[in-house]
Amino acid sequence: AVAGVDMVVGGECANAFCVIRPPGHHAGRTLHPMKAVSNGFCVLNSVASAALYATLNVSQGGLGLSRVCVIDFDVHHGNGTQDILCSTYDPRFLYVSIHAGGSEFNGLPAEDDINDLNALGCNSKNQGIYPGRCGDTSPHNGVLNIPLGAKVTAQAVGAALLTRVSPRVNSFAPDLIILSAGFDAHKNDPMGLGGLSAEDFGHITQVACQLAFNSCSGRVLS
């Protein structure tokens, strides 16, 4: 991810796709109930690492960008990325999370079974272990959380990007947009909470790239 930032910001390519799975958006800096910063099957938050590197002063080994926007679309809210970049307001970052939500998004029948890591989360009292339905509110202007219905669809994500994300991104005027794509939103994922096809991921990425052309000369890292 850091190498991708170098390539995009350095002008070697207009945008870049990093073959990383997962982006790590549940890994944060705050300890959760299991006394670790890793959670939700994520150990290293590559997206947050790339954003921090991009904005680090040149004298400290970074690239010195003023503003980076992270757009996260996934079944779950990216609690770790928000925790690292935006636990308090930081004018360098805008974090956008588009995720499943609503009262009908209640998880699996065994969601409170602490021994079943596949079931934990969603609307569970143990959601600190797997974040599930958190992220319905935005704590400050550096965060835009957009909970959708119970199933993530291309139509809903696309509409959110055009109607809610685009004005916010244009106002923020980032130097770089980083996409955090959650592939568990694929319609064939065994959890069954996503409705996206491979083509949908491509279309959503194209819409995000168009936002980048309008705001930061097309510089996108996914």
Model-derived regions, located:
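Fold-level signal for large, globular catalytic cores of enzyme and receptor domains
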Residues: 2-13
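Short, well-ordered coil/turn segments that N-cap beta-strands
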Residues: 13-14, 218
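A short helix->loop->beta-strand "cap" motif at the edges of active sites that frequently abuts
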Residues: 214-220
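Conserved alpha-helical scaffold segments that buttress catalytic/binding sites
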Residues: 6, 17-214
